[in-house]
Regions:
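A short alpha->loop->secondary-structure connector
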Residues: 1
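Conserved phosphate- and dinucleotide-binding cores of soluble alpha/beta proteins
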Residues: 11-149
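Short, conserved beta-strand segments within well-ordered enzyme catalytic domains
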Residues: 4
Length: 149
């Protein structure tokens, strides 16, 4: 497996799973204070364009029915590049990011193949689901199995 990430925590976790025979590539740039991720990328275009991604998982600052947004231009640009080269892009978004547009638009909402979230979508988002634009996967944290006592 080959993984490309800008997240330091992701890279460290993947590094621990040597049994997966994982090769990890880090995108170079400026370390964002307190975020454990690289922003303000330097010459990442050449690296990101070398790969064809089967799956890309990415977070965002917010979404609305028209788009997926990021607070940093550097983060937005790298996510756009990777989404364009991904066979399946998967957006990870928690309940606080719905109906929360931000400064830089990464993509149209419908450009994500799937959205994984921890909240039921509102009626407007449900209409998009019913129209088949995007696949929503709702992970209900209350349904997690509890340890036996």
């Amino acid at each position: 497996m080959v993984c490309v990430t800008n997240g330091l925590r992701n890279a460290f976790i993947l590094n621990e799973y040597q049994s997966l025979r994982t090769r990890v590539y880090m995108l170079g740039g400026e370390l964002k204070p307190g975020a454990a991720s690289i922003t303000s990328f330097t010459d990442t275009n050449s690296l990101t364009e070398q790969f064809v991604y089967d799956f890309s998982f990415f977070s965002c600052r917010g979404i609305d029915l028209d788009g997926v947004y990021e607070a940093s231009l550097g983060q937005a640009k790298i996510k756009q590049q990777i989404m364009r080269r991904s066979k399946h892009s998967i957006l990870l978004v928690d309940e606080h990011k719905f109906d929360s547009p931000h400064f830089y638009k990464i993509a149209d909402f419908a450009d994500s193949h799937s959205v994984i979230t921890n909240t039921l979508p509102t009626e407007d988002y449900q209409k998009r689901i019913d129209d088949g634009i995007t696949n929503f996967i709702w992970l209900n944290p209350k349904l997690r199995s509890q340890p036996n006592e």
